[in-house]
């Protein structure tokens, strides 16, 4: 993303955003990397820590573990020409693949069935054969933290995902990055991998940043 990265305009400060899994991790990383004592701050109601590294402004924010949670789309609709689709909580229509053995509309309007599909929210017994094939969407779990994260991401010149070094951490980081990308599509992104909160370990991790591991995140999501 180097060539396409957003460049700060004249007079605009560069900000590196570091995203950790928990508030304590954000606090410790700021203390270990900062040239001086970090400044504790809040974005809305979320604690963040601001500090300086070689003249560049950095800010760390801690999540609360998973900030998104998977769920089935709340309904399915069927059209003769296009087949089945899922309808997300936001009303977006997404592809769905259901077996041909399942009955298709028109249905009588008796819950959970509608004229052109199936309502899945109530987990009615009659809907279960359809539910297991419904598309999965990710819904906000920690809305306040997501709001704060997006506020920082808008202003970020680069983003470092510094969640835990395991598949769960990779998934949490991937979800956080998805939220950041909604407001900042071009900032370069890298991954800090570390196994202990010591100055040598954290310094080494941030001096040797790597790409995100999509396969590891997918493994976390399939659990």
Describe every region a protein language model picked out.
Residues 12-223:
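Intrinsically disordered, low-complexity regulatory segments
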